[in-house]
Amino acid sequence: MRIAVEGCCHGELDKIYAALAHLERVEHVKVDLLICCGDFQAVRNVDDLECMSVPDKYKELGTFHRYYSGEVRAPVPTLFIGGNHEASNYLWELYYGGFVAPDVYYLGHSGVVKFGDLRIGGLSGIFKGNDYRKGHYERPPYTHGGEVKSAYHVRQFDVEKLKSVAEPLDVFLSHDWPRGISRYGDQAELIRKKRFLADELRDNSLGSPPAEELLHALKPRYWFSAHLHVKFAAMVRHGDERCTRFLALDKCLPRRDFMQVIDLPDKSAAGGFTLDREWLSVLRANHARHSVTRKPASAPNSAPSSIAEHRTWVERNVSDEALKPPEFVKTIEPHDAANERRRPGQGTAPRGVERNPQTVRLMEMLALDFKLDLDPGGGGGVRGGNGGGGANNFQNNFRAPPPPQHQGQGGDWTGEGGGIQRYPIPREGPFTLVPRQARGAPPPPPPPRKADDNEINLDDL
């Protein structure tokens, strides 16, 4: 199997698929699966834009609506997670995952799915301690108390479900980086590229603490991220001789490192997307604990005996044929360029939650009740940081093992990279580590900060 991994999509599906077509035409490299690491922007019409956390002047329809409407079809199966710039109303319909368009699959707020025999897990959104322990209380039109932002903040409930996964993962996806990952790669080079990150890198505050926990708990073969608009590679060697190859990529712009092709000769794409039996068992074991109010979710049920009990139910009641995900169904009308007179920023946010037939079918298959459109009011418990949801109350006691001394500068496993002038796509794999190097002296302090139009204000994310 050969996969292409892309960083931030930002609604540029046409350009990303054009890059893949160029790669196939010029270098005769054909991929079986495209993976996008967030900020996908599955925007179907101008109303969806009102549910995306972007200033009006930056709201653009992008090209996804053409794939949603059926005007064009994805030329390669595509899998993505959510980031911090998404049409949150649409992704909430598919909280457990599903097709947002034909052959374009959303992994869910958290999830595990198979493509052929490649097992892929992922976590959508970004980490903010203020919202981490809250339930999923946000609903369209996201007009109360910053809901349009908090809707994409990672929740502890989703993280703990992923910690229950015991079977090996080949690939894991997150939008923001696991905290501390820079220690396993060339941190000095990262600071050279993104000087405004220097302080967070030095005090180890850059990145997601929950993602760091998942990295060391799940130990996937590969971990792909985006968010910071820079290419960065690292190698994490775990104590049990397993290792994780980490790669973050840029956004889709000319002459930027936004895509990497990776060869997986031991994997097959045969069968396409299928649901994962262990993950279905985890969903059943934890469904009753899922809070759709402000109240924090109950502690997830991660006991192996409980997961095993639900696994037995899944084995008995879910056939192999039923593991094929439900087919894509349109739930609203797509953008109509010929008749739509409203511009981006002039839409009307939808009120309420659409019951997506894919989600309904999944709940019926698992014999679970539908919770996504329940009234979030009256949950109590977590307001303004009280009840365990505030930043000051967030405690992360996890301490990752220190990286071996040789890893500080020797984590780039992706090779020279190569590039295509308009679409800088590194050449196909497999890729090997660069020679190990001893840890050098710490990088010098950065020069005084200057205004930079490209700088990312992490506090606004």
Predicted regions and their residues:
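Extended recognition/assembly regions associated with phosphoester-bond processing machinery
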Residues: 1-461
